[in-house]
Swiss-Prot record:
It is an enzyme of class 3 (hydrolase). This is 5'-nucleotidase SurE. Its EC number is 3.1.3.5. Nucleotidase that shows phosphatase activity on nucleoside 5'-monophosphates. Belongs to the SurE nucleotidase family. Its cofactor is a divalent metal cation. Keywords: Cytoplasm, Hydrolase, Metal-binding, Nucleotide-binding. The gene is surE. It is found in: Cytoplasm. Binds 1 divalent metal cation per subunit.
């Protein structure tokens, strides 16, 4: 078994190291991660310049001067002779639930695996600062082991969020849907030394839909949330109405 491991917090992140150590007994692990923290990079690819790959003398981890998606893309198309059995991303320093998944570099690294037909799992720790990281890595390894022993059909993309709790206090796993956030807080305006305005993106909004069945509800209740995602963004319920709208606008009968 071979696992390609990546993240969006960078190759020096504690979450990556903890997950690597937890997965080592399960498979051969190749690590390819971004050189820098790329939180919020989403699925961006670097197309305006060439990419360089380096290897850490301390850990043996490979890293690229690009995005999480670059990392997985380069590994799958330029380094590995055969596909890995699984792409794993994480453990992220903070949750990736609800609308977070659209911006998440952690989820994006996993998504790139799916683009090339490789099953993928993204792991995130719900709160920042790495509290109970070792326990989260233990849970992640259990989930990966279960997947390797009992694979899901097709090429699943699983988004997994782990509460910051001691292992003994976690209540188990729950399969969930994505919740929904309120819009983000407004940007924070400041002034640079030249007197010019600069802007910081505001904090994420609070949970809007945290009802039972959502990832927000599960993790707040002490459960590990497992949300299956898909790449097809088609709004199928809108197809008929959109056809009627387009037909009316084009003058077609």
């Amino acid at each position: 078994m071979r696992i390609l491991l990546s993240n969006d917090d960078g190759y020096l992140a504690p979450g990556l190291a903890a997950l690597y150590e937890a997965l080592r007994p399960l498979a051969e692990i190749l690590v390819m991660a971004p050189e820098q923290n790329c939180s919020g990079a989403s699925n961006s690819l670097t197309l305006s310049r060439p990419l360089s790959v380096s290897r850490s003398a301390a850990t043996g981890f490979y890293y690229v001067n690009g995005t999480p998606t670059d990392s997985v893309h380069v590994a799958l198309t330029g380094m590995l002779d055969t596909k890995p059995d699984l792409v794993v991303s994480g453990i992220n320093n903070g949750q990736n639930m609800g609308d977070d998944t659209l911006y998440s570099g952690t989820v994006a690294a996993a998504t790139e695996g799916i683009m090339f037909g490789v099953p993928a799992i993204a792991f995130s720790l719900v709160h920042k600062e790495w509290a109970h990281l070792g326990d989260a890595a233990r849970v992640a390894a259990e989930i990966v082991r279960h997947y390797l022993d009992h694979p899901l059909p097709g090429q699943p993309l699983l988004n997994i969020n782990i509460p910051n709790l001691p292992y003994e206090e976690l209540k188990g796993w729950r399969v969930t849907r994505l919740g929904k956030r309120h819009p983000s807080q407004p940007v924070i305006r400041q002034t640079n030394p030249r007197g010019e305005p600069i802007y910081w993106i505001g904090a994420a909004g609070d949970a809007l839909d945290a009802s039972e069945g959502t990832d927000f509800h599960a993790t707040a209740s002490g459960y590990v949330s497992i949300t299956p995602l898909q790449l097809d963004l088609t709004h199928t319920q809108m197809l008929a109405a959109t056809r009627d709208w387009a037909r009316a606008g084009s003058g077609a009968s």
